[in-house]
């Protein structure tokens, strides 16, 4: 049986933006992935004290954003899970759902890579997947040796990218909408229309 190489891109996607799509495309092409699965979070444990948009809206925006790319798909497994969202649990679920020989490539930013040794079941995460870490503009390159000291085995699991450097964030999109500014250059057109039609991120 031939192994399937599957990229995993998780996030609140509140909203999904062009930077997410650029990252997914870049990693797919560079590593020769067969597909990329987008996984909107339920209630992330690290954002337990923050209000995020309803899961249905975030899921719908992801579906709209990737509708023209057959090698992208979305799964709602974290949204359906009750309680806090943990990456290790999601990776274990994927191992049971996806074909047996599937290789998982988990995408994250350099900032999240720095925090990874403190994540829930971090050692299990690096056992279940390859890590693919990409920068944002202005971020300092992580000290991989130091991270490996904190989480032995991380370096062996890691693919450290120097690009794409993405300078877009969901918080920037939300802020611009709240201030009545356009976001068509930051999100796909269908997502911009959805935000407007559903009055997301507007001042209450």
Swiss-Prot record:
GO molecular function: ATP binding; nicotinate-nucleotide adenylyltransferase activity
This protein's encoding gene: nadD
Role summary: Catalyzes the reversible adenylation of nicotinate mononucleotide (NaMN) to nicotinic acid adenine dinucleotide (NaAD).
CDD domains from the UniProt entry: NMNAT
Signal peptide: none
Keywords of the record: ATP-binding, NAD, Nucleotide-binding, Nucleotidyltransferase, Pyridine nucleotide biosynthesis, Transferase
PANTHER family: NICOTINATE-NUCLEOTIDE ADENYLYLTRANSFERASE-RELATED (PTHR39321), PHOSPHOPANTETHEINE ADENYLYLTRANSFERASE (PTHR39321:SF3)
Natural source organism: Dehalococcoides mccartyi (strain CBDB1)
InterPro entries: Cyt_trans-like (IPR004821), NadD/NMNAT (IPR005248), Rossmann-like_a/b/a_fold (IPR014729)
Taxonomic superkingdom: Bacteria
Swiss-Prot/TrEMBL catalytic activity: nicotinate beta-D-ribonucleotide + ATP + H(+) = deamido-NAD(+) + diphosphate
NCBIfam families: cyt_tran_rel, nicotinate (nicotinamide) nucleotide adenylyltransferase, PRK00071.1-3
GO biological process: NAD biosynthetic process
EC numbers: 2.7.7.18
Pfam families with a match to the protein in the record: CTP_transf_like
Full protein name: Probable nicotinate-nucleotide adenylyltransferase
Pathways involved: Cofactor biosynthesis; NAD(+) biosynthesis; deamido-NAD(+) from nicotinate D-ribonucleotide: step 1/1
HAMAP family in alphabetical order: NaMN_adenylyltr
Family in the record: Belongs to the NadD family.
Presence of the UniProt keyword Signal in the record: no
